[in-house]
């Protein structure tokens, strides 16, 4: 992959990231093999985009927020960055476009299984071909993205729980009202959500009736 090709990818992904994910939170509702229900909230900011690209910045004056704006405005140049020596930049470029969706194209979620020695992340959401990793932000409970990965999520997590629904909200909103993914063949009447998210049952039913 050339730098020109990589620039083309980040230039096309930056507007999608801003439109679909920046200043938004996603809430994943999952079920494990015992049918227990779990929830994970993740939050996105423009400063997370640099981690997703694997670009190594050459100029000290470019921080993560500036980097995103340069990509968004198509002003980043080949002289501004290098590829990571271990090949991860090219890998991230291959999967980044498929992850810039409202729901990350994610069907499964799990705890990272430490299978890649140099990779640090906590939670992974994804599919059979592309995944996104999340870490706690400053230990305050908020999960933020810190990497993207190529390949089958089932090889990267301890147990791949099924995502049955994904909700999205903007930063200023108190509650989730937009549903951006629902799995097929979910017995919603049997799903018991944690108290803080029990209001989502009506959101789910409204969505299902509309579809």
Protein language model annotation of sequence segments:
Residues 206-211:
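Conserved small/polar residues in nucleotide/adenosyl-binding loops
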